[in-house]
Amino acid sequence: MKLMIFTGLVLFAIVSLIEAQAENGKPCLPEYKVCTHAPGNCCSDLVCDCYGRYKSGAQIGRNCFCLQKGVIYKREN
């Protein structure tokens, strides 16, 4: 009985460790990928930059993309 309890605890610890490593090992989002729902997942040299979308002065949505840090993007006509 003690052996079964010990084995169960060891298996639980191993599964918990594997899940923790899987969460920490998530791949990061590369440049120009959408990060609206995952702002902290951009690769280390990128930042999740968000822009509001407006129509007739009312905000209709928001887009976020992984972009280079310190780079300023301007609209072209």
Curated annotation (Swiss-Prot):
Annotated protein name in UniProt: U8-lycotoxin-Ls1o
Organism of origin: Lycosa singoriensis (Wolf spider)
Xref: InterPro entries: Spider_toxin_CSTX_knottin
Entry's localization field: Secreted
Pfam families reported in the protein's UniProt record: Toxin_35
Family: Belongs to the neurotoxin 19 (CSTX) family. 08 (U8-Lctx) subfamily.
Propeptide residues, chain positions: 21-26
Domain of life: Eukaryota
Keywords: Disulfide bond, Secreted, Signal, Toxin
Alphabetized GO MF terms: toxin activity
Disulfide bond among keywords: yes
PTM annotation: Contains 4 disulfide bonds.
Signal peptide annotation: 1-20
Tissues and organs where the protein is expressed, per its UniProt entry: Expressed by the venom gland.
GO CC annotations, alphabetized: extracellular region
Keyword Cell division appears in the UniProt entry: no
